[in-house]
């Protein structure tokens, strides 16, 4: 998938790469395959930015990060890497949440009964579980 398509709806402040084919998305260099977009996520014990050089050496096509690394490379700087990773992942999988319909049942009494009745009606109409 083209990087530009993956970045649809992602707010970024700096981008040093344009047309690149991305073959996957990864945030762990131990699982990175050549052609992947590497997301450098800040963490509690370690910071994914420490692994940018390793990711590029392993063949990452681009890096999604919160601050530009010192080394030159194909990166996209975003204000929140976790939010950007969520948006990029949604784009990668074709935004499946956009095709979902959610129902909610609220109230004090009768929620369980109502949900069982709704389930039975929807299964009868849609023919699926």
State where each predicted segment sits.
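N-terminal leader/targeting and accessory segments in enzymes
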Residues: 1-87
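Phosphate-binding loop of NTP-binding sites
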Residues: 7-10, 85-129
